[in-house]
Amino acid sequence: MSAFIGSWKLCESQNFDEFLRELGVNFFIRKAASTSKPTITFDKFGDNGLKMKTETILKTTEQSFTFGEEFDETTIDGRQVKSTVTRDSDTQLTQVQKHDDGNTVIVRKIEGDMMVTTATFKNITSVRKYQRH
């Protein structure tokens, strides 16, 4: 878990606009999100969780969660979802967001000084890479 603690700045993004389109995100938010370079900061939360802060040009969001426990989340584009984050290993987290249209699965994996985030909804997958900041 400590591998995630700190700040991460987006440095590479693949298929993100298509992923957001599949989720039903409107054109203007998609365009702003696709050009944004968000920073994600992780801090420890309790004995078995994390606090995740995402800062973009659109807005800043924060979620605190305990691994394995469902929580209410407002996504960066304003959707209300039920999320659960599990710790697969010290260097990998899997988040499942449940919403009206199905489930989005987000896997975050630490690879050296990079965090690779793979998000999948239906048949569309986006990969975003973040550099430790």
Swiss-Prot record:
Transport listed as a keyword: yes
PROSITE patterns hit by this protein: FABP
Keywords: Lipid-binding, Transport
GO molecular function: lipid binding
Pfam families cross-referenced by the UniProt entry: Lipocalin
Keyword Membrane: no
Gene3D superfamilies: 2.40.128.20
InterPro entries attached to this UniProt entry: Calycin (IPR012674), Fatty_acid-bd (IPR000463), ILBP (IPR031259), Lipocln_cytosolic_FA-bd_dom (IPR000566)
Similarity comment: Belongs to the calycin superfamily. Fatty-acid binding protein (FABP) family.
Full protein name: Fatty acid-binding protein
